[in-house]
């Protein structure tokens, strides 16, 4: 564990403008609590975008639409939660026949820097609609996206201890800055872990470790704890490190050739075994030079 000194970290200097879109009936409270925390950063702001769905040819009269608006407002009001983090998301109601288009409009209007979306489990009542919405939004690459996954839909996320897995590279800076913003908002202890594996080429392992060290130095958080964990399986290493933490933050898979695949099978299996909530961060920019898979010692993909 290595304490670090304060230096400049440019990503943390930006003012976050957060949008948390929600659909009626989804597991919204964990997602909203993360949105509030991200918007609590200095100069930050946020919007809870309540999307009232209009289906062509079904109950589209004025009375029916007004009833759906009232139902949505009551549902959103019922999502209030107790927390030391002050509520930062203002509520905007939008009637829409195209969810993705309405979110894109809201992003442009508010100049949003981050979207916060539910990462649905198999128990999520709106999982099919949310998965389809995610597929439509991923190609845009206009904002960073934080995907929030929790096994307790009725409980806001209020972690005392946060673990963030940092690989190294440009995308990892967004993961690290997101973790730092959440830790600052919640007053949480923050641990950054770097998982090393023998499966990839030693030169790449060295570059990633040097990048990780630089990211830690740039974070400007002397209280941040740092760990190096060696494991033959990165997902297994994260699972072991996650014990005792209340929130785990990971980066999404970054594959220019297949940008819609956010997480590999092994990592997804690991996430399903975690007892605590998970935030997966997908940066808006995908590096064209970053391989989608680790490079093994023999020069081939592992």
Regions found by a protein language model. Name each.
Residues 7-74, 80-92, 158-228, 247, ...:
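Small/aliphatic-rich secondary-structure junction motif
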Residues 210-214, 230-242:
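A short, acidic, amphipathic alpha-helical segment used as a generic capping/interface helix at domain edges
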Residues 1, 32-34, 106-155, 239-302:
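Gly/Ser-rich helix-loop-strand patches that form or flank binding pockets
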Residues 87-92, 98, 102, 124-129:
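A cross-kingdom feature marking solvent-exposed beta-strand/loop segments within repeated
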Residues 94-100, 229-235:
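Conserved active-site histidine-acidic residue motif and adjacent donor-binding/catalytic loop
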Residues 30, 102, 237:
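Phosphate- and divalent-cation-binding pockets in alpha/beta enzyme and binding domains
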């Amino acid at each position: 564990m290595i304490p670090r000194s304060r230096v400049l970290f440019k990503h943390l200097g930006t003012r976050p403008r957060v949008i948390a879109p929600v659909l009626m009936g989804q597991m919204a409270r964990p997602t909203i609590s993360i949105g509030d925390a991200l918007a609590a950063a200095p100069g930050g702001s946020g919007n809870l975008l309540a999307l009232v769905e209009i289906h062509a040819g079904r109950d589209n009269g004025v009375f029916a639409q007004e009833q759906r608006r009232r139902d949505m407002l009551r549902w959103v009001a019922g999502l209030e939660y107790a927390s030391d983090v002050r509520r930062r998301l203002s509520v905007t109601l939008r009637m829409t026949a195209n969810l993705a288009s309405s979110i894109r409009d809201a992003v442009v209007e508010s100049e949003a820097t981050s979207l916060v979306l539910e990462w649905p489990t198999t128990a999520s009542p709106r999982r099919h609609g949310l998965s389809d919405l995610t597929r439509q939004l991923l190609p845009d690459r206009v904002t960073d996206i934080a995907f929030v996954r929790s096994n307790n839909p009725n409980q806001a996320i209020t972690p005392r201890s946060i673990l963030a897995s940092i690989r190294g590279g440009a995308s990892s800076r967004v993961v690290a800055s997101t973790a730092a913003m959440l830790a600052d908002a919640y007053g949480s202890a923050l641990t950054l872990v770097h998982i090393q594996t023998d499966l990839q080429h030693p030169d790449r392992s060295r570059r990633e470790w040097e990048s990780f060290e630089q990211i830690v130095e740039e974070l400007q958080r002397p209280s941040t704890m740092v760990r190096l964990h060696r494991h033959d399986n990165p997902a297994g290493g994260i699972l072991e490190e996650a014990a005792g933490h209340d929130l785990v933050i990971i980066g999404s898979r970054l594959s220019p050739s297949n940008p819609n695949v956010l997480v590999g099978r092994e990592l997804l299996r690991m996430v399903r075994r975690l007892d605590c909530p998970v935030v997966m961060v997908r940066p808006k920019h995908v590096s064209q030079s970053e391989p989608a898979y680790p490079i093994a010692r023999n020069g081939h993909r592992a």
